[in-house]
From Swiss-Prot:
This reaction introduces a second double bond into the aromatic ring system. GO terms for molecular function: chorismate synthase activity; FMN binding. GO terms for biological process: amino acid biosynthetic process; aromatic amino acid family biosynthetic process; chorismate biosynthetic process. It comes from the Bacteria. This is Chorismate synthase. Keywords: Amino-acid biosynthesis, Aromatic amino acid biosynthesis, FAD, Flavoprotein, FMN, Lyase, NADP. It comes from Protochlamydia amoebophila (strain UWE25). NCBIfam families: aroC (TIGR00033), PRK05382.1 (NF003793). It holds the Pfam family Chorismate_synt. HAMAP family: Chorismate_synth. The gene is aroC. Homotetramer. It catalyses: 5-O-(1-carboxyvinyl)-3-phosphoshikimate = chorismate + phosphate. NADP(+) binds at R48. The lineage of its organism: Bacteria, Pseudomonadati, Chlamydiota, Chlamydiia, Parachlamydiales. The keyword Flavoprotein applies.
Length: 367
Protein backbone atom coordinates (compact mmCIF):
# COMPACT_ATOMS: atom_id res chain seq x y z
CA UNK A 1 0.00 0.00 0.00
CA UNK A 2 1.57 3.26 -1.15
CA UNK A 3 0.65 6.89 -0.45
CA UNK A 4 1.17 6.95 3.31
CA UNK A 5 3.39 10.05 3.18
CA UNK A 6 2.52 13.74 2.94
CA UNK A 7 4.66 16.82 2.35
CA UNK A 8 7.80 17.80 0.44
CA UNK A 9 10.51 19.19 2.72
CA UNK A 10 8.58 18.62 5.96
CA UNK A 11 7.35 15.10 5.24
CA UNK A 12 5.28 12.87 7.49
CA UNK A 13 4.71 9.16 7.00
CA UNK A 14 1.99 7.57 9.14
CA UNK A 15 1.48 3.92 9.98
CA UNK A 16 -0.82 1.71 12.04
CA UNK A 17 -4.39 0.37 12.06
CA UNK A 18 -7.39 1.20 14.23
CA UNK A 19 -7.22 -2.06 16.21
CA UNK A 20 -3.51 -2.75 15.82
CA UNK A 21 -0.94 -2.43 18.60
CA UNK A 22 -0.09 1.20 17.95
CA UNK A 23 -0.25 4.20 15.65
CA UNK A 24 2.87 6.00 14.56
CA UNK A 25 4.35 8.75 12.44
CA UNK A 26 7.84 9.52 11.16
CA UNK A 27 8.65 13.14 10.32
CA UNK A 28 11.51 13.71 7.90
CA UNK A 29 12.85 17.19 7.25
CA UNK A 30 12.11 18.89 10.55
CA UNK A 31 14.70 21.64 11.10
CA UNK A 32 17.13 21.29 13.98
CA UNK A 33 17.03 23.44 17.08
CA UNK A 34 13.28 23.31 17.76
CA UNK A 35 12.59 22.90 21.47
CA UNK A 36 10.14 20.01 21.81
CA UNK A 37 8.68 17.81 24.56
CA UNK A 38 6.19 14.96 24.59
CA UNK A 39 3.84 17.25 26.50
CA UNK A 40 3.85 19.71 23.58
CA UNK A 41 2.39 16.94 21.44
CA UNK A 42 0.15 15.41 24.11
CA UNK A 43 -1.69 18.65 24.73
CA UNK A 44 -2.65 18.75 21.04
CA UNK A 45 -3.64 15.06 21.06
CA UNK A 46 -5.96 15.73 24.00
CA UNK A 47 -8.31 17.83 21.87
CA UNK A 48 -8.67 15.06 19.30
CA UNK A 49 -8.92 12.06 21.64
CA UNK A 50 -12.18 10.06 21.84
CA UNK A 51 -14.25 9.85 25.00
CA UNK A 52 -13.44 13.45 25.97
CA UNK A 53 -17.15 14.25 26.37
CA UNK A 54 -20.60 12.79 25.72
CA UNK A 55 -20.68 14.12 22.14
CA UNK A 56 -17.86 11.91 20.85
CA UNK A 57 -17.00 8.21 20.56
CA UNK A 58 -16.86 6.45 23.96
CA UNK A 59 -13.63 4.68 22.98
CA UNK A 60 -11.20 5.55 25.79
CA UNK A 61 -7.70 6.03 24.46
CA UNK A 62 -4.92 7.62 26.50
CA UNK A 63 -3.32 9.06 23.37
CA UNK A 64 0.03 9.72 25.01
CA UNK A 65 2.95 10.00 22.60
CA UNK A 66 6.44 8.57 22.95
CA UNK A 67 9.23 10.30 21.04
CA UNK A 68 11.58 7.55 19.84
CA UNK A 69 14.12 9.54 17.82
CA UNK A 70 15.18 12.91 16.47
CA UNK A 71 15.57 14.68 19.83
CA UNK A 72 18.65 15.45 21.95
CA UNK A 73 18.69 17.57 25.09
CA UNK A 74 15.15 18.69 24.38
CA UNK A 75 15.84 19.95 20.85
CA UNK A 76 15.26 18.52 17.40
CA UNK A 77 18.49 17.39 15.75
CA UNK A 78 17.38 17.46 12.11
CA UNK A 79 17.21 13.65 12.06
CA UNK A 80 13.89 11.86 11.44
CA UNK A 81 11.48 12.23 14.36
CA UNK A 82 9.68 8.97 15.14
CA UNK A 83 6.54 9.08 17.29
CA UNK A 84 4.42 6.21 18.62
CA UNK A 85 0.97 6.23 20.25
CA UNK A 86 -0.17 2.92 21.71
CA UNK A 87 -3.74 1.69 21.18
CA UNK A 88 -5.03 0.89 24.66
CA UNK A 89 -8.82 0.47 24.29
CA UNK A 90 -9.36 -1.99 21.44
CA UNK A 91 -12.47 -4.20 21.18
CA UNK A 92 -12.38 -6.20 17.95
CA UNK A 93 -14.99 -8.77 19.00
CA UNK A 94 -17.81 -6.50 17.79
CA UNK A 95 -16.56 -6.90 14.21
CA UNK A 96 -16.00 -10.67 14.12
CA UNK A 97 -19.39 -11.63 12.67
CA UNK A 98 -19.38 -9.10 9.86
CA UNK A 99 -16.01 -9.46 8.14
CA UNK A 100 -17.60 -10.73 4.90
CA UNK A 101 -20.19 -7.96 4.77
CA UNK A 102 -19.84 -4.67 2.91
CA UNK A 103 -20.69 -1.88 5.33
CA UNK A 104 -22.66 0.98 3.73
CA UNK A 105 -20.62 4.18 3.55
CA UNK A 106 -17.37 2.44 4.58
CA UNK A 107 -14.16 1.64 2.72
CA UNK A 108 -14.12 -2.15 3.10
CA UNK A 109 -15.66 -2.68 -0.36
CA UNK A 110 -13.08 -0.53 -2.19
CA UNK A 111 -10.11 -1.70 -0.10
CA UNK A 112 -11.08 -5.36 -0.60
CA UNK A 113 -11.36 -4.88 -4.36
CA UNK A 114 -8.05 -3.03 -4.61
CA UNK A 115 -5.87 -5.12 -2.30
CA UNK A 116 -7.70 -8.44 -2.04
CA UNK A 117 -7.54 -8.22 1.75
CA UNK A 118 -8.96 -5.85 4.36
CA UNK A 119 -8.43 -5.41 8.08
CA UNK A 120 -12.09 -5.13 9.04
CA UNK A 121 -11.41 -4.43 12.73
CA UNK A 122 -12.64 -0.90 13.21
CA UNK A 123 -11.86 -0.04 9.61
CA UNK A 124 -8.15 -0.86 9.82
CA UNK A 125 -6.04 1.63 7.89
CA UNK A 126 -9.16 3.44 6.61
CA UNK A 127 -10.23 4.37 10.14
CA UNK A 128 -10.16 7.95 11.39
CA UNK A 129 -7.93 6.58 14.15
CA UNK A 130 -5.10 7.32 11.69
CA UNK A 131 -5.65 11.04 12.25
CA UNK A 132 -4.03 10.81 15.68
CA UNK A 133 -0.74 10.62 13.74
CA UNK A 134 -1.57 13.78 11.81
CA UNK A 135 -2.32 15.72 14.97
CA UNK A 136 0.97 14.56 16.51
CA UNK A 137 2.92 15.72 13.46
CA UNK A 138 0.83 18.87 13.28
CA UNK A 139 1.80 19.75 16.85
CA UNK A 140 5.43 20.01 15.73
CA UNK A 141 4.46 22.00 12.64
CA UNK A 142 2.42 24.42 14.79
CA UNK A 143 5.37 24.89 17.11
CA UNK A 144 7.61 25.89 14.18
CA UNK A 145 4.95 28.26 12.84
CA UNK A 146 4.44 29.78 16.27
CA UNK A 147 8.15 30.60 16.42
CA UNK A 148 7.68 32.80 13.34
CA UNK A 149 4.47 34.38 14.64
CA UNK A 150 1.89 32.32 12.73
CA UNK A 151 -1.27 30.90 14.33
CA UNK A 152 -3.66 28.29 12.94
CA UNK A 153 -7.17 28.09 14.40
CA UNK A 154 -10.13 25.90 13.42
CA UNK A 155 -13.66 25.65 14.77
CA UNK A 156 -16.95 23.90 14.06
CA UNK A 157 -18.72 26.14 11.55
CA UNK A 158 -21.93 24.13 11.31
CA UNK A 159 -23.77 20.94 12.20
CA UNK A 160 -26.52 19.95 9.79
CA UNK A 161 -28.27 23.14 8.72
CA UNK A 162 -27.33 25.12 11.85
CA UNK A 163 -24.48 27.56 11.21
CA UNK A 164 -22.32 29.19 13.85
CA UNK A 165 -20.08 31.42 11.75
CA UNK A 166 -17.82 33.82 13.60
CA UNK A 167 -16.64 37.19 12.31
CA UNK A 168 -12.92 37.11 11.67
CA UNK A 169 -12.56 40.85 12.34
CA UNK A 170 -13.76 40.31 15.91
CA UNK A 171 -10.84 38.02 16.75
CA UNK A 172 -7.88 38.87 14.52
CA UNK A 173 -6.21 40.91 17.28
CA UNK A 174 -6.63 38.27 19.99
CA UNK A 175 -6.11 34.83 18.47
CA UNK A 176 -5.08 33.11 21.75
CA UNK A 177 -8.40 34.12 23.34
CA UNK A 178 -10.28 32.80 20.31
CA UNK A 179 -8.40 29.49 20.54
CA UNK A 180 -9.20 29.17 24.24
CA UNK A 181 -12.88 29.97 23.67
CA UNK A 182 -13.10 27.29 20.98
CA UNK A 183 -11.45 24.66 23.16
CA UNK A 184 -13.66 25.48 26.12
CA UNK A 185 -16.63 24.38 24.01
CA UNK A 186 -17.56 20.68 23.83
CA UNK A 187 -18.40 21.28 20.15
CA UNK A 188 -15.32 23.39 19.37
CA UNK A 189 -17.73 26.22 18.57
CA UNK A 190 -17.39 29.76 19.96
CA UNK A 191 -20.78 30.70 18.51
CA UNK A 192 -24.07 31.28 20.41
CA UNK A 193 -25.54 28.82 17.89
CA UNK A 194 -23.62 25.98 19.60
CA UNK A 195 -26.64 25.03 21.72
CA UNK A 196 -28.80 24.66 18.61
CA UNK A 197 -26.07 22.55 17.03
CA UNK A 198 -26.02 20.35 20.10
CA UNK A 199 -29.78 19.91 19.81
CA UNK A 200 -29.47 18.69 16.21
CA UNK A 201 -26.75 16.27 17.28
CA UNK A 202 -28.76 14.90 20.21
CA UNK A 203 -31.82 14.42 18.02
CA UNK A 204 -29.85 12.43 15.45
CA UNK A 205 -28.21 10.31 18.13
CA UNK A 206 -31.54 9.47 19.81
CA UNK A 207 -32.81 8.29 16.44
CA UNK A 208 -29.75 6.09 15.98
CA UNK A 209 -28.59 8.35 13.17
CA UNK A 210 -25.67 10.70 12.53
CA UNK A 211 -25.17 14.19 11.16
CA UNK A 212 -22.60 16.03 9.05
CA UNK A 213 -20.88 19.35 9.61
CA UNK A 214 -18.41 21.94 8.33
CA UNK A 215 -15.08 22.97 9.86
CA UNK A 216 -13.67 26.43 9.14
CA UNK A 217 -9.96 27.07 9.64
CA UNK A 218 -7.91 30.26 9.60
CA UNK A 219 -4.18 30.98 9.50
CA UNK A 220 -3.04 34.37 10.78
CA UNK A 221 0.15 36.31 9.96
CA UNK A 222 1.20 34.17 6.99
CA UNK A 223 3.45 36.52 4.97
CA UNK A 224 3.04 37.24 1.29
CA UNK A 225 4.98 34.79 -0.89
CA UNK A 226 4.28 31.27 0.39
CA UNK A 227 3.18 28.68 -2.15
CA UNK A 228 4.29 28.00 -5.71
CA UNK A 229 2.56 28.55 -9.06
CA UNK A 230 0.78 26.05 -11.27
CA UNK A 231 0.91 22.57 -9.67
CA UNK A 232 2.06 23.46 -6.16
CA UNK A 233 -0.38 26.26 -5.43
CA UNK A 234 -0.88 26.85 -1.74
CA UNK A 235 -4.64 26.31 -1.99
CA UNK A 236 -4.11 23.15 -4.08
CA UNK A 237 -1.93 21.64 -1.36
CA UNK A 238 -4.41 22.72 1.30
CA UNK A 239 -7.20 21.07 -0.69
CA UNK A 240 -5.24 17.83 -1.01
CA UNK A 241 -4.51 17.88 2.71
CA UNK A 242 -8.13 18.41 3.69
CA UNK A 243 -9.58 15.92 1.22
CA UNK A 244 -7.22 13.27 2.60
CA UNK A 245 -8.96 13.46 5.99
CA UNK A 246 -11.45 10.59 6.46
CA UNK A 247 -15.09 11.62 5.80
CA UNK A 248 -14.18 15.00 4.24
CA UNK A 249 -16.24 15.80 1.17
CA UNK A 250 -15.08 19.14 -0.18
CA UNK A 251 -12.92 22.22 0.13
CA UNK A 252 -13.45 25.96 -0.07
CA UNK A 253 -11.06 28.87 0.23
CA UNK A 254 -12.29 32.43 0.68
CA UNK A 255 -15.76 32.81 -0.81
CA UNK A 256 -15.42 29.35 -2.34
CA UNK A 257 -18.46 28.20 -4.31
CA UNK A 258 -20.21 31.49 -3.52
CA UNK A 259 -17.65 33.21 -5.78
CA UNK A 260 -19.37 31.62 -8.78
CA UNK A 261 -22.45 33.73 -7.99
CA UNK A 262 -20.55 37.02 -7.58
CA UNK A 263 -19.43 39.66 -10.05
CA UNK A 264 -15.84 40.75 -10.48
CA UNK A 265 -16.67 44.10 -8.92
CA UNK A 266 -17.81 42.23 -5.80
CA UNK A 267 -15.11 39.59 -5.59
CA UNK A 268 -11.93 41.52 -6.45
CA UNK A 269 -9.96 42.43 -3.32
CA UNK A 270 -8.83 46.04 -3.73
CA UNK A 271 -5.41 47.17 -2.55
CA UNK A 272 -4.86 49.62 0.26
CA UNK A 273 -2.24 50.83 2.72
CA UNK A 274 -2.28 49.85 6.39
CA UNK A 275 0.53 50.66 8.83
CA UNK A 276 2.62 51.82 5.86
CA UNK A 277 2.32 48.37 4.27
CA UNK A 278 0.47 47.21 1.15
CA UNK A 279 -2.67 45.38 2.23
CA UNK A 280 -6.15 44.52 0.99
CA UNK A 281 -9.47 46.22 1.76
CA UNK A 282 -11.30 42.86 1.64
CA UNK A 283 -10.31 39.18 1.60
CA UNK A 284 -12.77 37.41 -0.69
CA UNK A 285 -9.91 35.37 -2.16
CA UNK A 286 -9.21 33.84 1.24
CA UNK A 287 -5.54 34.77 1.47
CA UNK A 288 -4.05 33.60 -1.85
CA UNK A 289 -3.64 34.92 -5.39
CA UNK A 290 -2.05 32.83 -8.14
CA UNK A 291 -1.50 30.05 -5.63
CA UNK A 292 0.70 32.29 -3.46
CA UNK A 293 -0.17 33.78 -0.07
CA UNK A 294 -1.11 37.47 -0.06
CA UNK A 295 -0.38 38.27 3.57
CA UNK A 296 -4.08 38.27 4.45
CA UNK A 297 -5.54 35.56 6.73
CA UNK A 298 -5.96 32.24 4.93
CA UNK A 299 -9.55 31.07 5.40
CA UNK A 300 -10.81 27.63 4.37
CA UNK A 301 -13.86 25.44 4.93
CA UNK A 302 -14.04 21.63 4.92
CA UNK A 303 -17.39 19.77 4.91
CA UNK A 304 -17.66 16.34 6.52
CA UNK A 305 -20.29 13.74 5.72
CA UNK A 306 -22.48 12.18 8.43
CA UNK A 307 -20.78 9.31 10.26
CA UNK A 308 -21.28 6.15 8.19
CA UNK A 309 -21.72 3.95 11.28
CA UNK A 310 -25.34 4.42 12.37
CA UNK A 311 -27.67 2.42 14.56
CA UNK A 312 -30.14 1.64 11.77
CA UNK A 313 -30.81 -1.54 9.81
CA UNK A 314 -29.53 -1.08 6.25
CA UNK A 315 -29.68 -3.36 3.23
CA UNK A 316 -26.27 -4.46 1.97
CA UNK A 317 -24.36 -7.26 0.25
CA UNK A 318 -21.75 -9.75 1.37
CA UNK A 319 -18.63 -10.83 -0.54
CA UNK A 320 -20.69 -13.45 -2.42
CA UNK A 321 -23.09 -10.78 -3.68
CA UNK A 322 -25.92 -12.01 -1.47
CA UNK A 323 -28.41 -9.46 -0.14
CA UNK A 324 -28.38 -9.17 3.64
CA UNK A 325 -29.22 -6.75 6.41
CA UNK A 326 -26.46 -4.79 8.07
CA UNK A 327 -26.77 -3.79 11.70
CA UNK A 328 -24.28 -1.84 13.78
CA UNK A 329 -22.47 -4.46 15.89
CA UNK A 330 -23.28 -4.49 19.59
CA UNK A 331 -20.46 -2.82 21.48
CA UNK A 332 -19.14 -0.81 18.53
CA UNK A 333 -18.24 2.80 19.32
CA UNK A 334 -18.57 5.74 16.96
CA UNK A 335 -18.87 9.52 16.81
CA UNK A 336 -22.39 10.81 16.06
CA UNK A 337 -20.74 13.68 14.13
CA UNK A 338 -17.19 13.24 12.85
CA UNK A 339 -16.86 16.98 12.15
CA UNK A 340 -16.43 17.71 15.87
CA UNK A 341 -13.20 15.78 16.37
CA UNK A 342 -12.11 16.75 12.86
CA UNK A 343 -11.49 20.30 14.12
CA UNK A 344 -7.98 19.60 15.53
CA UNK A 345 -7.24 17.40 12.50
CA UNK A 346 -8.02 20.23 10.08
CA UNK A 347 -5.84 22.52 12.19
CA UNK A 348 -2.98 20.01 12.06
CA UNK A 349 -3.19 19.45 8.31
CA UNK A 350 -3.27 23.19 7.65
CA UNK A 351 -0.18 23.63 9.83
CA UNK A 352 1.62 20.83 7.97
CA UNK A 353 0.95 22.45 4.59
CA UNK A 354 2.04 25.86 5.85
CA UNK A 355 5.28 24.70 7.47
CA UNK A 356 6.16 22.91 4.22
CA UNK A 357 5.44 26.11 2.28
CA UNK A 358 7.53 28.06 4.80
CA UNK A 359 10.55 25.82 4.21
CA UNK A 360 10.02 25.82 0.43
CA UNK A 361 9.92 29.63 0.43
CA UNK A 362 13.56 29.70 1.51
CA UNK A 363 14.65 28.40 -1.91
CA UNK A 364 12.92 30.81 -4.29
CA UNK A 365 15.49 33.65 -4.22
CA UNK A 366 19.25 33.42 -3.74
CA UNK A 367 19.78 37.06 -2.79
Amino acid sequence: MASNSFGHLFKMTTWGESHGKAMGVVIDGCPSGIFLTEQDINQELYWRKPGRNELTSPRLEEDQVEILSGLFNGQTTGAPISLIIWNKDVNSSAYEGMHTLFRPGHANYTYSNKYGIFDYRGGGRASARETVCRVAAGAIAKKILSDVGISVVAYLYSIGEIEGKIELSDHVNNVPLLQQTIRNSSLFSPSPAAEKMKGVLEEARKEGDSVGGIVEAMAFNVPCGWGDPVYEKLEANLAKAMLSIPASKGFEIGEGFKASQMRGTEHNDLFGIQNDQISFVTNHAGGTLGGISTGEPIIIKVPFKPTSSINKVQTSLNEKGEICDYRLPTGSRHDPCVAIRAVPVVEAMMALVLVDAFLMSKFCQLN
